[in-house]
């Protein structure tokens, strides 16, 4: 589906007579607005409330029409705080949906849901805007080629490889490293692939948004000296913002990514942190819009809302959007409707494990729970597929033996099982990796490991060639040569102590 960008911003349309209404009811972030008969705005039109509150402060609130109620009334959701709004205030129908700036001028800048820059670097130098509501590309426009997207992260590339132009979910509870993994992916992809990224911060912590921005400036993903050379545009609708903003900020980020794909014909990376907050924001306004809650209190339109966002994230013959979405899993319950609905749209899942994080193995990606539709011999090749399967079998056998080890001890195992356990523990540690973005608090230099090197390393462990090396030599290293060098250093240190 080609974008039809306009050359006017999201201002009020300049008709001879503006379509004016007035507020009749305010319930938190939801407004009811009455319009003259025959002048009702369309669904998804942007409405603007301008005026002054009781203490004389200027008010400028943008809302989006969600429902036509009858009796010449509409129900709209506000994109910013409704503090100071009063019944009777004048409301202007802009006549168009929310439109945001798109194109090269968005790179290196931070925007809110309305496409307004919020980084104090002045106005955005673009007259090209695009509406945030569009239909997904048609079947005939889709690209069906299958190819791997190398990330440089061993556990991901080997066991749950990402598809170029696919959708990937990062699953995990609070504090197991989703955002750090996303930052590492942005860093690696900008450096290794030279691609353009769009980051949508949906309902996450403001502090994390600030940290990410600073990290990007440090790593050169955002170029402070020459903003136009930057590789990422940032769109934030953080936790402190009303649900309307959090519900639509994902669409704002996606609209910017679609322009790079359809008009600039580029391969784009779209990061959404966190897709669960998109669902959560929808559920917050759903009851206020008068909808009956569904399972676990979620909105009845959950699947429709998720589908309208996800189906626009795809590859066309012009370019591709590869999307990596962090998915917060409430109470670590993968059957919760929010993560369960997200699963249906994904090509690969990267599941983060609290158990691995507790062991200090980072990235804490669960090698047995993480999946990918790309892990097939005809796509990745026989060697990659066989290596991945043998790694999974070894780790699965180790998992089965853990109860026996806990009760009877390692000595009660057969010789073959003891060897399996030793190799599995080395594999588990070799799946860890020092990150560029975590250098500050690990003290280890970050490592990017190519897929060929990754496969070679795991084949050497599985073949038994490295059985004599201590397992700590495999912890937080890049390729297998670093592990053997670390083993030599450990041996020298122990000899010196003697």
From Swiss-Prot:
ATP-binding recorded as keyword: yes
Gene Ontology cellular-component annotations: chloroplast thylakoid membrane; mitochondrion; proton-transporting ATP synthase complex
Organism: Phaseolus vulgaris
Binding locations of ATP: 172-179
Membrane topology: Peripheral membrane protein
GO function terms (MF aspect): ATP binding; ATP hydrolysis activity; proton-transporting ATP synthase activity, rotational mechanism
Enzyme class per UniProt: translocase
Highest taxon above the source species: Eukaryota
EC number annotated for this UniProt entry: 7.1.2.2
Tagged with keyword Thylakoid: yes
Subunit record text: F-type ATPases have 2 components, CF(1) - the catalytic core - and CF(0) - the membrane proton channel. CF(1) has five subunits: alpha(3), beta(3), gamma(1), delta(1), epsilon(1). CF(0) has four main subunits: a(1), b(1), b'(1) and c(9-12).
Cysteine pairs bridged by disulfides in the record: none
Protein name, UniProt field: ATP synthase subunit beta, chloroplastic
GO BP term (any one): proton motive force-driven mitochondrial ATP synthesis
Short name of any one Pfam family annotated for the protein: ATP-synt_ab
Catalytic reaction annotation: ATP + H2O + 4 H(+)(in) = ADP + phosphate + 5 H(+)(out)
The encoding gene: atpB
